[in-house]
């Protein structure tokens, strides 16, 4: 999203999360502000997720073939892992902002997001990932479903997130090394 913002291209967001232990599992609250639309996503631990103050939930279950999926393939060293996804899934988009895409899954607009470059910074997606989890979504970092991770600028990961576990499992199978 940084390049989007620098160029004046929507979407771009500002994110903030608070953790009591420096790990994702310690996240107490999170906010994602969509800078061009003014939408504000937020969540507190155990309190669910909201969009502009209204409770949100993830979309109904879809199979990968009919799901609306966002991906980031810029500078992807392992395009061979994306090929099965491209041939299997019908609705693929690239928005250029993982935090935006995660919040859109939380509100039911998107069904999944895939970024297997290994360069997603934990601090760039932590707030949106917390909101997604509080809305009922699920995720995998570096191939581990629901894994904890440190909230440091140096911590990077592969990220696959989805509205429901069966969809996440299908996407992990399609993109496995």
Question: Where does each model-flagged region fall?
Answer:
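Short secondary-structure boundary micro-motifs
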Residues: 1-2, 24-26, 32-33, 78, ...
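DPxDG-like acidic metal-binding loop motif
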Residues: 3-46
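An extended, acidic
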Residues: 46, 56-177
